[in-house]
Amino acid sequence: MDIYMSRYEEITQQLIFSPKTWLITGVAGFIGSNLLEKLLKLNQVVIGLDNFSTGHQYNLDEVKTLVSTEQWSRFCFIEGDIRDLTTCEQVMKGVDHVLHQAALGSVPRSIVDPITTNATNITGFLNILHAAKNAQVQSFTYAASSSTYGDHPALPKVEENIGNPLSPYAVTKYVNEIYAQVYARTYGFKTIGLRYFNVFGRRQDPNGAYAAVIPKWTAAMLKGDDVYINGDGETSRDFCYIDNVIQMNILSALAKDSAKDNIYNVAVGDRTTLNELSGYIYDELNLIHHIDKLSIKYREFRSGDVRHSQADVTKAIDLLKYRPNIKIREGLRLSMPWYVRFLKG
């Protein structure tokens, strides 16, 4: 028997029979909309908050087509901004579990616009954290980031060992962790921070200047455009499929008190180079949609990027019974049909 997945299955069954009320911030985004889909399919009541700065209405529209009419009726969407404390207080009424995903992501974006990144990721986080504490919610899980490891050279990355931040974005996500720790010590309000490592999957936006590498390259291949690799292509990352992230959010929300007031890596524990990744995407895409050729162009390394990233997920496995069951190749295979539909119509 797979004890790790049985814990996740046990929790999801428990939720079906005893529904809770959830708040998802950033609900119209990539991760937020996937959490929404999963929770509605578990017959949960969900309040969603988004200001559409990076999220999209079409993500919510898609979720609506994937759940029943009754399940969709349990969803209440509020268009609002986490930078407004009053909004955060209003959406928190009656909430059991908070999944805080709203943020301005992207290292390059934070270098171009550190002021807005700070306002959203630090002030916005503090507003949601404070409102949740005052509302006495049962759990508060927030999206942290692997960027917090900064220039620390050790591999794999262990939660306790971090270096100096390499971008304004990394600073904001680290400040989130510090605030969470202070709220636990000062107010007894315990949270769980999830350090995401290069999450990918369905509904990850391929458009825009700050698109992540997998959707950006997938779109380029489908259009017959060049694939641009920053540096020599030997930069490596621990790519984590969206279903692993959903699992960790739900495990965290229903975690025992002894596992709270903690930070956990959310990844697979593997390392894939950009050169390998481009080949994997090409292979998986070609299985369902013919690609004439793969044209790769190399350019300068990107400012603020770390050379290698790989997570140690032992802590999540031990304390939360996490099981990163979907690896990079399977995750890409599951993702490609969505991208073909989205980009080819």
Swiss-Prot record:
Its EC number is 5.1.3.7. This is UDP-N-acetylglucosamine 4-epimerase. GO terms for biological process: O antigen biosynthetic process. Signal peptide: none annotated. Optimum temperature is 37 degrees Celsius. Optimum pH is 7.0-9.0. It comes from Plesiomonas shigelloides. Belongs to the NAD(P)-dependent epimerase/dehydratase family. GO terms for molecular function: nucleotide binding; UDP-N-acetylglucosamine 4-epimerase activity. Changing R307A: No effect on epimerase activity. Disulfide bonds: none annotated. Changing H308A: No effect on epimerase activity. Binds 1 NAD(+) per subunit. The lineage of its organism: Bacteria, Pseudomonadati, Pseudomonadota, Gammaproteobacteria, Enterobacterales. The gene is wbgU.
